[in-house]
Amino acid sequence: MKLDQVARSLLLKEFVSGFVLAMKYFFKPKATINYPFEMGHRGPRFRGEHALRRYPNGEERCIACKLCEAICPAQAITIEAGPRRNDGTRRTTRYDIDMVKCIYCGMCQEACPVDAIVEGPNFEFSVETREELLYDKQKLLENGDRWEREIARNIAVDAPYR
């Protein structure tokens, strides 16, 4: 037994096996990206910052059905509906999302019958105060206007699987 230990230490078996393993990984392609300068791929089902969408004519899509508010497990969505219009439709007077409470589960997006509320492609929305994470209707509509092209493309790509 002692002779075996002497042979191992003289031949540096552990060192050589560790060195071989390190060299194997040293020459493989890198698995990480240089984040601020390179962006990783985000699939069409990526769930990022929330947005309210509009129809091509500029009218907001939300019909104040409150399904998203009812299905939200975190109770992060608050909606107030206005009175019915002459054409029988309703629109929201207040649409708030508390992004601190939101768990980004996507259930609001799945429940919406008109694809009004979506989780967009943006994941870089750090803020300095908690109040900035209380999104009102105007902020959500601005997000929708900003990301509409990419949101529409993601919905079109994902449509066969819905």
Curated annotation (Swiss-Prot):
Oligomeric form and interacting partners: NDH-1 is composed of 14 different subunits. Subunits NuoA, H, J, K, L, M, N constitute the membrane sector of the complex.
Cofactor note: Binds 2 [4Fe-4S] clusters per subunit.
Organism: Methylorubrum extorquens (strain PA1)
EC primary class: translocase
Cofactor(s) needed by this chain: [4Fe-4S] cluster
Keyword Nucleus: no
PROSITE patterns from the UniProt entry: 4FE4S_FER_1, 4FE4S_FER_2
Keyword terms: 4Fe-4S, Cell inner membrane, Cell membrane, Iron, Iron-sulfur, Membrane, Metal-binding, NAD, Quinone, Repeat, Translocase, Ubiquinone
Domain 4Fe-4S ferredoxin-type: 52-82, 93-122
Binding site for [4Fe-4S] cluster 1: C62, C65, C68, C112
Function comment: NDH-1 shuttles electrons from NADH, via FMN and iron-sulfur (Fe-S) centers, to quinones in the respiratory chain. The immediate electron acceptor for the enzyme in this species is believed to be ubiquinone. Couples the redox reaction to proton translocation (for every two electrons transferred, four hydrogen ions are translocated across the cytoplasmic membrane), and thus conserves the redox energy in a proton gradient.
GO terms assigned for molecular function: 4 iron, 4 sulfur cluster binding; iron ion binding; NADH:ubiquinone reductase (non-electrogenic) activity; quinone binding
Residue sites binding [4Fe-4S] cluster 2 per the record: C72, C102, C105, C108
Alphabetical list of InterPro entries matching this protein: 4Fe4S_Fe-S-bd, 4Fe4S_Fe_S_CS, NADH_quinone_OxRdtase_chainI
Listed name of the protein: NADH-quinone oxidoreductase subunit I
Membrane topology: Peripheral membrane protein
Family statement: Belongs to the complex I 23 kDa subunit family.
